[in-house]
Amino acid sequence: MRRSLFLTVLTLLVYSPSLFSRQLAIVIDDLGYSLVNGKRSIDLPGKVTVAILPFAPNSVGLAEYATRKNKEVIIHLPMQAKSEINQKTESPTLNVAMSTIQYTIILNTSLSRFAQAKGVSNHMGSLLTERENPMRQVLSATGNRGLYFLDSKTSSQSIAKRVAHQAKVPYVARDFFLDNIKSEQNMKSIMSNAFTLSRKTGDAVIIGHPYKGTLDFLERELRNLPTDIDLVFVSQLTTIDQAAVGLP
């Protein structure tokens, strides 16, 4: 009996490498402007999640295209940054100075933009994600629609994790930006770091952008992932984080 059990376990170990697989989620942010790069992002191999700006010119069409291609769509919700110098500000962008009525209208209109959406992430938002009342409204509206929240972590002082826990909203946070430095050498290093983190903790989240160099890189790399790394949608990683109480 013991020998039979041992052989069964050994067979599983030998023939089921996925038993020990680690999870990696890759998100392509800022879709909605370039139709060509948007479609290239969606056409990347595997379970890539695409974050689409709600009111960009090609946002609705790209969301529909992503659904046809069996990709996961999230709403990339524009939020106020601490500094908007030399940065393009989307219109409309949630702003801490807005009236409650204006804020609510923009929030609800944005979150209703794509019926296909599974989640919400913050576009910019280094200021707003630190503010209690604005984030409570965002997370409440997110939860009411059955969506998860991906924190892009544009601020190390983001309170999204704690507020999501209190609102019982599924939550996950970015671990790495792939292309803040756009060289292939840097992107290879980021991918390697993500593999290491995934093997250590069980998962990792990378955010990239629809730059030509990034897409060229991912088209190659995603076809040659290590055998112990599983590419997954962000929704497969989200949790109602029980450890978030009292955390910033």
Residue ranges and their predicted role:
Residues 1-6:
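Bacterial N-terminal signal peptides that target proteins for export
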Residues 15-16:
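N-terminal signal peptide c-region/cleavage motif recognized by signal peptidases
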Residues 20-22, 191, 195, 238:
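Terminal interaction modules at protein C-ends
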Residues 21-87:
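Active-site beta->alpha N-cap acidic-glycine motif
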Residues 24-28, 48-50, 73-77, 120-122, ...:
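Hydrophobic faces of well-ordered beta-strands that scaffold small-molecule active sites
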Residues 66-116:
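Substrate-binding cleft of extracellular glycoside hydrolase catalytic domains
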Residues 97, 101-192, 209-226:
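Catalytic domains of cell-wall/extracellular-matrix polysaccharide-remodeling enzymes
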Residues 198-241:
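C-terminal alpha-helical cap/extension of soluble enzyme domains
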